[in-house]
Design a protein with these regions (language model features):
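A short macromolecule-binding patch
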Residues: 173-176, 215-220
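Short aromatic-glycine-enriched beta-strand elements
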Residues: 208-212
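Sparse recognition of residues in long alpha-helices and their boundaries
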Residues: 160, 213-214
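Primary recognition of N-terminal secretory signal peptides and signal-anchoring hydrophobic helices
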Residues: 2-207
Length: 220
């Protein structure tokens, strides 16, 4: 009888150890599953920017298009201008001339100059109105704004241009505690930026129980 008890005790101990190990594995997996991820995005890769380029975010929607920042002036590709928010701009590639027409005037600006004419009358800016880079034609944002109803916000490191062509109100919410915003919904998604307690966040949209927001320093 004593021999049976002696054999039973080691077997019980081994079984208990296996149970404890399995329980520990389960606990670790549960903790890992519900612990928020700490890995961050490569912010330049996230916004697809490099060098003097800046990301173009149009009406709070990220695009694959880029804008140029040259001598502290922002330049937008003419194709993005005409396709997104002002079809009245026309680029004459033969003459190297940007043309804009209204009911009363014809406005012209040659590439690489700070001068433009309004129905023949000369005017000047402090920047080159049109820049050419290979096959691409870029127009200064400040010049575009003269004839286009748009608002914009620009942020650095990395460069991000938020263009708004629509009016309207939007909701905001204040962060109740220090937090982060993530690339996608889910606690394991990569971190894009930190959020301070009390920071005002612009609500963009609700997605599957998660809220897409824009931070005060221009991250979405």
């Amino acid at each position: 009888m004593k021999e049976k008890i002696k054999k039973f005790i080691p077997l019980f101990v081994v079984t208990a150890l296996i149970f404890v190990i399995l329980l520990g594995v389960v606990i670790v997996k549960v903790v890992q599953r519900y612990t928020p991820g700490k890995e961050r995005v490569d912010i330049n890769e996230y916004y697809n920017v490099n060098g003097s380029d800046a990301a173009l975010i149009y009406n709070d929607v990220m695009t694959e298009d880029l804008v140029k920042v040259i001598d502290n002036n922002i330049y937008i590709d003419i194709d993005d201008v005409t396709s997104n928010f002002n079809q009245r701009f026309y680029w004459d590639s033969y003459e190297g001339l940007l043309i804009y027409t209204t009911d009363k005037d014809v406005i012209k600006a040659y590439a690489g100059t700070k001068e433009y004419t309004v129905s023949g009358q000369k005017n000047n800016t402090e920047y080159d109105i049109v820049k050419i880079d290979g096959q691409n034609v870029y127009v200064a944002l400040d010049y575009i704004k003269k004839y286009t109803k748009i608002d914009y916000e620009y942020y650095e490191n990395p460069g991000r241009l938020y263009l708004y062509s629509v009016d309207g109100t939007y909701q905001t919410v204040k962060a109740k505690k220090k937090s982060v915003i993530r690339r996608k919904g889910g606690i394991k998604s990569l971190i894009v930026a930190d959020v301070k307690k009390g920071e005002e966040l612009k609500i963009i949209e609700e997605i599957d129980g998660w809220t897409k927001v824009k931070t005060e320093d221009g991250y979405i």
